[in-house]
Amino acid sequence: MVHFTAEEKAAIASLWGQVNVEETGGEALGRLLVVYPWTQRFFDTFGNLSSASAIMGNPRVKAHGKKVLTSFGDAVKNLDNLKGTFAKLSELHCDKLHVDPENFRLLGNVLVIVLANHFGKEFTPQVQAAWQKMVTGVANALAYKYH
């Protein structure tokens, strides 16, 4: 279980309140697919993923990115129970989708980069540390079923 301090919870919640879920989610998933092209195999029904511009402009990538980032909203609300919050998604990704759990860590790291880009100076080292802790906790919760 990950323990978050009151300061970390406040930093996460404060930034989350300013996140444009649709824009940020689409960008994070798009960047994942561009930077780590082997992750594209899980999205073979998404149509054209042949180039960075095709991926970043793909409406299915944007829609799924929004869906993924929306689930991070559940994490923000349930920081003290990430494993329970993501139990069903862990089962889905393990048993049905067969997603390599390393991809959860990669997506979390990409999300932190996107947030840093969007929020600039507001994304202080303390805020980054809190978010990195959260995305690592989410990745571990999603990977739980694999163990």
UniProtKB/Swiss-Prot annotation:
CDD domains: Hb-beta-like
Keyword NAD: no
Keywords attached to this entry: Heme, Iron, Metal-binding, Oxygen transport, Transport
Family statement: Belongs to the globin family.
Annotated positions binding heme b: H64, H93
CC per GO annotation: blood microparticle; haptoglobin-hemoglobin complex; hemoglobin complex
Domain Globin span(s) in chain numbering: 3-147
GO BP, sorted A to Z: hydrogen peroxide catabolic process
Keyword Ribonucleoprotein among record annotations: no
Domain of life: Eukaryota
Job description of the protein: Gamma chains make up the fetal hemoglobin F, in combination with alpha chains.
GO molecular function terms listed in the Swiss-Prot or TrEMBL record: haptoglobin binding; heme binding; metal ion binding; organic acid binding; oxygen binding; oxygen carrier activity; peroxidase activity
Coiled-coil features, chain-numbered ranges: none
Tissue expression: Red blood cells.
PANTHER family on file: HEMOGLOBIN FAMILY MEMBER, HEMOGLOBIN SUBUNIT EPSILON
Protein name in the entry: Hemoglobin subunit gamma
Binding partners and assembly: Heterotetramer of two alpha chains and two gamma chains in fetal hemoglobin (Hb F).
